[in-house]
Design a protein with these regions (language model features):
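Long, contiguous internal "core" modules enriched in hydrophobic/ aromatic residues
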Residues: 1-304
Length: 304
């Protein structure tokens, strides 16, 4: 199969960008950054600087006037700060969800996660004659338990056996396992946890899915600021969220979910994300509006 692109050295990559109209003040530094960050990773940041066909909307291999490699790097560095901040912010949310699930399911039974009889209707659902939802989840949980090298897991197994109470077991569950366990939980548990978050159970479940996708982007170094997010979470009637309902498919809307959870659950002062947004490089080619942030963004849920 023929390759669609020819190999180009870093020097040739710089020259290609220059011939297409991207200003590069320091070619040597540009080569160094291309070598350490990769041409196609950076291309996501200069893509909005390209000219587009008037009617078809197809991107041309020509840059807009004023486009520069330096701005590309500034946008990348902003996005890098944003990824790190998002990952840290979601870490707090994940820990809170773990604790709430462990506590509320533990109130039902210490081993509720192991016995479908203690769970809700969704746990019993099955497709055709295959395993039910809980059995599939339980297989993943047991695999995680076997693979864990955590000292507390080894200690607990030696002293008590492999059946860990839910408030211990949640510590080896990743976000996906926690989300599915929340979905399988009995309504009383789902509602208690959702109430603490100021949401209904279906709303919180949709938030957990959205935030898990965002966490995966952050963990895998994916571009965040200039992306369309496919899953739109269900919102409550909180006025702070109503004002951002129209941008839930952009990063600003997704960031608002993190901020809301931090405020609602008292996880932090919620200042880090607004501080990072304030570092967005000021320019006319790729404005902050690309994130979905309105002009009055600082008065919305991100800072309230």
């Amino acid at each position: 199969m023929a390759l669609s692109k020819d190999f180009k050295s870093y020097t040739e990559q710089v020259e290609l960008l220059r011939t297409r109209g991207l200003y590069i003040g320091d070619p040597d530094e540009a080569e160094h950054l291309l070598a350490s960050l990769n041409y196609y990773r950076l291309s996501g940041y200069w893509y909005p600087m390209r000219r587009f066909q008037p009617n078809g909307g197809i991107a041309l291999d020509v840059f807009k006037a004023g486009a520069s490699f330096e701005l590309v790097v500034e946008l990348y560095e902003f996005d890098e700060r944003l990824r790190h901040c998002v990952f840290g912010g979601l870490d707090r949310v994940e820990m809170a969800v773990r604790a709430m699930i462990g506590y509320e399911l533990g109130r039902i039974d210490p081993l509720a996660h192991l016995d479908v009889a203690y769970l809700g209707p969704r746990a019993h659902a099955r497709s055709c004659s295959g395993p039910n939802v809980h059995e599939v989840w339980l297989g993943k949980y047991r695999a995680a338990l076997r693979a864990s090298r955590e000292e507390f897991v080894t200690h607990y197994k030696k002293k008590h056996g492999s059946k860990m109470p839910i408030w211990v077991a949640v510590e080896i569950m990743d976000w996906g396992m926690l989300s599915h366990l929340y979905g399988m939980a009995p309504n009383i548990v789902r509602n208690r946890i959702a109430h603490r978050c100021g949401l209904s159970a279906p709303q919180l479940e949709s938030w957990l899915k959205s935030l898990n996708i965002m966490r995966n982007y952050a963990a895998h170094h994916a571009r965040m600021f200039n992306r369309v997010y496919d899953i739109k979470p269900k919102l409550n009637e909180d006025p702070r969220l109503v004002q951002v309902a129209g941008v839930m498919n952009r990063v600003f809307g997704q960031l608002s979910l993190i901020q809301y959870m931090h405020h609602q659950l008292g996880l932090s002062t919620a200042q880090r994300l607004p501080e990072v947004l304030n570092t967005f490089p000021d320019n006319d080619i790729v404005p902050l509006a690309r994130t979905g942030a309105p002009n009055h963004w600082s008065s919305l849920v991100l800072c309230s």
